Amino acid sequence: MPVLFAAATQNDLQFFNKVATKMEGLIFIYVFANTKWNKLEKELAEICTYVRGNNLIKFQNKINDLIDEEIADAKNNLVDPKYLQENYMKSKFVVHRVDFHIAKTLKLGANIKRDDFTLEHIIPQNSQEGLRKSTPPDTSIDEYSKLIHRIGNMTILSKSSNSSIGDSTPYEKIISYEGGKPQYDGTLIPITKVLIDGNLEVISGKKTAPVKFSNRYDLKKLNLYKDAYWSEDQVKKREKSFFEILSDIYGVNLN
């Protein structure tokens, strides 16, 4: 907070936004690295001095140095199933932050009520029957269940849609349910819609901003393992896309 107060004294919105986003990036890394907050407290005076002096370069360099000290632990925890299961709200932030950035950047979903959004696990989280049906025949259920809490297994749905598909498999959600349309069909939420048809929104043409964004971050429709199963390969590809987006937001390297 003192850093933002210092930035606000400059009466420069662009400067303030750059400082705020960089600080958000530092806090993001500290949260996922489980860094003790007194470490940041010791650096606040120096950070605020750079900000009050309108020295963006020194400020950014200082924050980058602090990030570099912790980023390895953060990156490990971002793909650690046990850590993510025990820190559900951190995972939730990642997915919602990516969704917010896409919507803001591309001006998508202005009519979507985001307070109706909830986190959805593509491999079902709370259904043993759903997990059993989702597991590939050449994989143990215990091993497959480790993917449930990975960030690449997460997307966003409306609360009403999420509550009705608890036992469903990824195939039923993404490809076809009972021979008809998939259960995610009809959603306008970009990171979920792209799973169905490869598009972030209802678009036409190949040079639109959403298509360029999709290509930039490789946000595309993913082929299922053996055309039927959501596997670690799809999870990793989705994580790579999400982490690339976050890397560009915060000016770090999360992949």
Regions inferred by a protein language model and the residue ranges of each:
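Betabetaalpha-Me/HNH-type nuclease active-site subdomain
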Residues: 52-197, 238-239, 243-246, 250
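Short intrinsically disordered, low-complexity coil segments enriched in acidic
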Residues: 1-8, 117, 188, 222
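C-terminal, well-folded lobe of enzymatic/effector domains
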Residues: 14-21, 28-31, 35-38, 65-70, ...
